Amino acid sequence: MTPKVFYISDGTAITAEVFGHAVLSQFPIEFEALTIPFVETIQKAQKVKQQINDCFITTGERPLVFHSIINPEIRNVIFSSECVDYDFLNTFVAPLEQHLGVQAKPLLHRTHGKSNHGYETRIDAINYTMENDDGQTMKHMDKADIILLGVSRCGKTPSSLYLSMQFGIKAANYPFTEEDMDNLKLPEALKRNKSKLFGLTIDPHRLHEIRQSRMENSRYSSLRQCRLEVKEVEMLYKKERIPFVNTTNHSVEEIATKILDITGLERHMF
């Protein structure tokens, strides 16, 4: 039977999800997960407790519960359910209080709420990235923190959005198209911002698979065209000394981490 998992919080549950995913990803099995945010009252906690207990009765196994609940009364209600409990925040808060000599003063939603000083930074970055996606405009490249380059469908847009949403980085991206291949070069707007350029590449066979699902049996999706574009773009990266990574079989999180590691871009943590 597939193990059941609950991610619970009196806030957004983002912290509980991130912690839980990081732990469970170490195990080569599938989990059935349910996220329950904003458990802010005893009444809501009692309902969640009943859900957990019902799950135990139905399956005969105690579900895993990852939570980041600040309110101790609400936390105790969840503790009393038939679950295997993993309390992310309080596991670390007490030792840190002792080490720092400072008592924690929890604020609900502090980590992901609007009150966070980085909220506007994140929103500005997301807006910038969406407005400068896929070379829609070249007018504001000077304002970018990074400009991702690559052929169509190599992962530019999801990587750009992840960088902006997760780290508040203004990430523009520019596509090299089929029409560019005869005389591939950097546009002037990119030349002016060469220090911000970062390339993405991909295995031609994987690119062929991705494009086939979008435009089957077209020149655009042919393996020959995919090989040509990847070859030409990689030659340009090397000629212009633009750093690049191969996105094949990597998640967007891994791609973004590689980009940050190579470029040394500042991460705005929220």
From Swiss-Prot:
Keywords on this record? Answer: Kinase, Nucleotide-binding, Serine/threonine-protein kinase, Transferase
This protein's superkingdom?
Answer: Bacteria
Q: Which InterPro entries match?
A: Kinase-pyrophosphorylase, PSRP
Q: Which reaction does it catalyse?
A: [pyruvate, water dikinase] + ADP = [pyruvate, water dikinase]-phosphate + AMP + H(+); [pyruvate, water dikinase]-phosphate + phosphate + H(+) = [pyruvate, water dikinase] + diphosphate
Q: Where does ADP bind?
A: 150-157
**EC number, as in UniProt:** 2.7.11.33, 2.7.4.28
| Family affiliation | Belongs to the pyruvate, phosphate/water dikinase regulatory protein family. PSRP subfamily.
Q: What does this protein do?
A: Bifunctional serine/threonine kinase and phosphorylase involved in the regulation of the phosphoenolpyruvate synthase (PEPS) by catalyzing its phosphorylation/dephosphorylation.
Protein name (record): Putative phosphoenolpyruvate synthase regulatory protein
